[in-house]
Amino acid sequence: MIGSRHAFDLNGPTACEVIQPTDRDRIAARLGQDPLRRDADPEIAWERVRRSRTAIGTLLLNQSVIAGVGNVFRADLLYSLRIHPERPGRSLERTQFDQLWQTLQRMLRIGVKYNRIVTADPAEVGKSPGRMRREERLLVYKKQACRECGQIIASWKLGGRTIYACQRCQS
């Protein structure tokens, strides 16, 4: 929808409704840190992750921990860092979390810039993100085999969604 002052991209939301400013503030208060915002504080997200026994793959989908992470980014982010999705959040080292945050920022910014999810490194593919085919843009999500070791990609339910991972490369 495009109006004289505003535009809305309704591609993807499962629900859309007009709300009052007080409702917006209440909803926003429940959200975790958004890696795309300049004022995001990764320290707040780190505190939530480091204290949790919950699997990092589940924590990443919890919008009150880190806002904006969906299923594709979750799978490919963890694959890119070689972190198993079932690993408890509290088992991550601070350096791993910092790397996770920075990688997530990079992936999300590329997605915004090109209006599509791109988690693979365009330099490795040899194409700009805008020219990459869907199967070239993703690392592990809905893949058959691991691009590194060739092992069959495992998939199972985690946090209510299907996760994809290489059981050999992600530990």
Pin down the residues of each PLM region.
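Structured catalytic/nucleic-acid-binding cores of DNA maintenance enzymes
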Residues: 1-171
